[in-house]
Amino acid sequence: MNRKKQEILNLLKTHFALITLFLFIASCTQTYTPTKYSIEQFYQNNQIGGGAFSDDETKLLVRSNESGIFNVYEIDIASGEKTQKTFSEKESFFAIDYLPGTNQILYSADKGGNELSHIYLMNEDGTTTDLTPGENEKARFAGWSKDKKSMYFTSNKRNPQFFDFYKMNIETWESEMLY
C-alpha cells in the first residue's frame, strides 16, 4: 500500500508540474499586431548591400537602389558622404571591389535583364571596360590571388551549360582557365 501511495504521489507531482508549466507559458503570451505598410511605403524602401573597403580603408563600395535601380556608390568613411559612381537607369549595377592598390572599381551587370552578368572595370575617370565580353557569357567574381596581381572568376564562355574557373592577370587583363 505504501508503494501505491508513493506512485500516486509521484503522478500528482508530475501533473502539478505540467499544469504549472502550462499556466506559466499561457500567461506569457502577448497579442502581437504586426505593423501594416502601404504599397507606396513598401516600394519607397531603399536597399543597400555588398561592401568592399578601399586598400586604405577610407572608402566603402556598396550598391543601392535609391536612384530607382541598383547602382554603385562609394561612402567616405570619415564623413559618411555617399557618392554615386554609376548612373544606370536600365540595368542594375552591383559593386564588387576596388582593384588592389587603386581607386578603380569592379562591378557586375547584365544587359537589358538578360541575366548574363559581366564583370566591368571602372577607371578613375569614369570610363568602363567589360572584362568578360563574351556575347553569351555569364561571369561571377570569385576573389583575388594572394599576391593581389590576379583575380579569379567563374564563367560559362566555353560552354553555356558549365561554369569554369578562371584566373585573370590584372596588369595584362589576360585570363586562363584553371578548371
Q: Can you say where each PLM-predicted feature lies in the sequence?
A:
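Multi-bladed beta-propeller domains
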Residues: 29-48, 74-94, 112, 122-138, ...
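Bacterial N-terminal signal peptides that target proteins for export
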Residues: 3-17
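A detector of repeated loop/turn-to-beta-strand junctions in beta-rich toroidal repeat architectures
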Residues: 69-71, 116-118, 162-164
